[in-house]
Amino acid sequence: MISLRQHAFSLAAVFLALAVGVVLGSGFLSDTLLSSLRDEKRDLYTQISGLNDQKNMLNEKVSAANNFDNQLLGRIVHDVLGGTSVVVFRTPDAKDDDVAAVSKIVVQAGGTVTGTVSLTQEFVDANSTEKLRSVVNSSILPAGAQLSTKLVDQGSQAGDLLGITLLVNANPAVPNVGDAQRSTVLVALRDTGFITYQTYNRNDHLGAANAALVITGGLLPQDAGNQGVSVARFSAALAPHGSGTLLAGRDGSATGVAAVAVARADAGMAATISTVDNVDAEPGRITAILGLHDLLSGGHTGQYGVGHGATSITVPQ
């Protein structure tokens, strides 16, 4: 007969064996798990290294393509804007590099930049319609000019006024606005907070231009309000007064509520202005110049780039 002490020793031995088994088993499982994790980590590092190599290779190809474009740029745009002038408009989200690069190519193409007009945040937010209307409908309107009664929103009204003021009408029967009247309009819009501007003439006057180039940014957040619509309508309202208007945005500008996307989605605007959706890249900058040349030569509007709604990568030859 087993005594109570023997029974206690037996139970203790069983529990000790279980404890030893658990320790040994957990050690084995732990080693196996750690080994598996090490293998997975090694595989992930290998994948990351491979992806970095691919990224570097793609960056090198992009850099080579841009260098190639830079080398050929002079030949591609040679004299395509010869004897013509361009006024550059920029939105608050336009990048300095884009504005400077495209303005430089205008000159390389044989054209001149009469000046740069910067639209303020108050302008693109389009929340000051009454304030702008009071400026537009004041005595600053150049003599003999008439604003369109069909344009009632802030962006369109300003585009109409600045189109009359800053662009040489394609119809030779329409007289150009004089320097003094042009200055009156610009100063009024500047002093009321809608624009700032920079001239490139020795007499400090912003001269009349044959075409307009509107440079904007990229993707806008969904809560951007009327910014994209305002810029698109502004650009479209400029167009009837000159020989061509082109709206150029960065990567993302053809998406959502951004200006290029708005212009392309509206059949009327798309028939009035040309657009480029990759002005942050050398091919897009060259295309902007070729697009202006096409408009100045009496060609049709086009939607160029790689984004949604583009009908061609660049201007067909």
Swiss-Prot record:
Keywords: Cell outer membrane, Copper, Ion transport, Membrane, Porin, Signal, Transmembrane, Transport. GO terms for biological process: copper ion homeostasis; monoatomic ion transport. GO terms for molecular function: porin activity. It is found in: Cell outer membrane. It comes from the Bacteria. Pfam families: MctB. The keyword Cell membrane does not apply. Pore-forming protein, which is involved in efflux of copper across the outer membrane. Essential for copper resistance and maintenance of a low intracellular copper concentration. This is Copper transporter MctB. It comes from Mycobacterium leprae (strain TN). The lineage of its organism: Bacteria, Bacillati, Actinomycetota, Actinomycetes, Mycobacteriales.
